[in-house]
Regions:
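Membrane-embedded alpha-helical bundles that constitute the cytochrome b-like, heme-associated redox core
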Residues: 1-176
Length: 176
């Protein structure tokens, strides 16, 4: 992407900063967010992931109000890939590490793209299997479940405001 001129290089760098901002936000939200957004709510063993995938292949997957076991692993992998990709991208931009860092950045970015596709496919399959719109649930916070599984009104959104503001301010400083 950056070989096509300076304008595309700036777009690439801005996209890298945006990915870094999203990763920082998700890590913070995974600690201070709502009940099902917290990392502690979706710690699953590899055995439970394979069991869930087996159930899914048999068209009888268990229903999860929060993240299902396969989706939870996808989130952890995407966060790690996002961190590695942005760190390697910053190193390439700062000309630290040489050609192997560029190669690593390329491999990481394509691996992350593949994982994003896998995750989106998982969301579609899970949405169809459970007859629910998971994308809408991610955006509005509403999902099918029992009343005791509901999230009470969260004060977390007020905690997250400074983080979002800092990320947006950083992007504005970079753009100007």
């Amino acid at each position: 992407m950056t070989g096509d001129g300076e304008a595309w290089r700036l777009v690439h760098v801005a996209a890298g900063y945006a990915v870094a901002g999203v990763i920082v936000f998700r890590i913070f939200w995974g600690v201070a967010g709502t009940r099902y957004a917290r990392f502690t709510s979706f710690l699953f063993s590899p055995r439970s992931v394979f069991a869930y995938l087996g159930e899914l292949l048999k068209s009888k997957p268990g229903h999860w109000v929060g993240h299902n076991p396969a989706g939870s692993y996808a989130i952890y992998i995407l966060i790690l890939l996002g961190l590695a990709t942005t760190v390697s991208g910053f190193a390439v931009y700062a000309e630290i590490g040489g050609e192997w860092v560029e190669d690593a950045h390329d491999v990481l970015s394509y691996t992350m793209l593949g994982m994003v596709c896998f995750h989106v496919l998982g969301v579609v399959v899970s949405s169809l299997a459970h007859h629910e719109n998971l994308v809408r649930s991610m955006l509005d916070g509403y999902k099918q479940g029992k009343s005791e599984e509901a999230i009470e009104s969260s004060k977390s959104r007020w905690v997250i405001a400074p983080v979002v503001s800092a990320v947006l301010a950083s992007l504005l400083v970079f753009i100007s």
